Amino acid sequence: MAHQTGIHATEELKEFFAKARAGSVRLIKVVIEDEQLVLGASQEPVGRWDQDYDRAVLPLLDAQQPCYLLYRLDSQNAQGFEWLFLAWSPDNSPVRLKMLYAATRATVKKEFGGGHIKDELFGTVKDDLSFAGYQKHLSSCAAPAPLTSAERELQQIRINEVKTEISVESKHQTLQGLAFPLQPEAQRALQQLKQKMVNYIQMKLDLERETIELVHTEPTDVAQLPSRVPRDAARYHFFLYKHTHEGDPLESVVFIYSMPGYKCSIKERMLYSSCKSRLLDSVEQDFHLEIAKKIEIGDGAELTAEFLYDEVHPKQHAFKQAFAKPKGPGGKRGHKRLIRGPGENGDDS
């Protein structure tokens, strides 16, 4: 399988970044095209930064397409002019695009130069990234106040970006709900599974590029399934389980998350665990694959035919009580009385 490279800025965009940092540009729009960061648009300053803001920013916010905007302020620090970083992810854009732009956000800041960025905003509607929205953001930073939905999402994205500094103590706050984007080959494999063109998919996380990539789609039956599970690395597996239940032939998609315990680093274990739920959401919602059973294992040897069948069709442990004679009334009972019939006592009366 040919592994795709991560998303980075083109040479033309890098050159434009260098030119813009000198102060001749007010606004830069960056978009993702053909797995690369490219220049989408730019504008020169007309007036002060606050006068230029809305007329420069708002027309560039597409209702369907995420993007990044870098907006130059008039203030300077030791490295030169200060900039705002605006991440636009409209509600109407496809989920896969949102995930791709969220995962690439840190790369854009790194390519531009994080030391030049004074502040950043995240927006899902235009009001979030308007000049008034920026003023509200500054006010919320200055005083403790409830965060807007956009600010909460930005806060979660910032938390996710810290995932490279993982410790046992920080795992719950840094790794909730990570969404690594599926590489195109992995997406195609899921579509093929939906069409039953393949019956097995194995995926892994690329921790450097922050993506979910396809390992292989080798044809696999139940007997071969245990041998597909690596003993020294975590994996996600999707298996089309063909079997018979109560006389009916069935085909059930089973998701298997294999994690060989402490043979994997803490970082790897936590990233796989955190990305799992968002991956399954995408598989069920975007690819319309119904997952019959979700299984977690530590060793491939667990995947026997009996184990799979019992997981997909759990046994109903109904308690059946044997028939017993009804008990008599509770409490103490008197002595038995012997009632003799006529003539039984020897009398002829």
Swiss-Prot record:
Modified residues (N6-acetyllysine): K14
Biased composition (Basic residues): 330-339
InterPro entries (alphabetical): ADF-H (IPR002108), ADF-H/Gelsolin-like_dom_sf (IPR029006), Twinfilin (IPR028458)
Domain of life: Eukaryota
Residue numbers bearing the Phosphoserine modification: S349
Any one GO molecular function term: actin monomer binding
Residue ranges that the Swiss-Prot or TrEMBL entry lists as coiled coil: none
Residues with N-acetylalanine modification: A2
Modification sites for Phosphotyrosine: Y309
Signal peptide from the UniProt entry: none
UniProt similarity note: Belongs to the actin-binding proteins ADF family. Twinfilin subfamily.
SUBUNIT field: Interacts with G-actin; ADP-actin form and capping protein (CP). May also be able to interact with TWF1 and phosphoinositides, PI(4,5)P2. When bound to PI(4,5)P2, it is down-regulated. Interacts with MYO7A.
Function: Actin-binding protein involved in motile and morphological processes. Inhibits actin polymerization, likely by sequestering G-actin. By capping the barbed ends of filaments, it also regulates motility. Seems to play an important role in clathrin-mediated endocytosis and distribution of endocytic organelles. May play a role in regulating the mature length of the middle and short rows of stereocilia.
Protein name in the entry: Twinfilin-2
High-level lineage: Eukaryota, Metazoa, Chordata, Craniata, Vertebrata
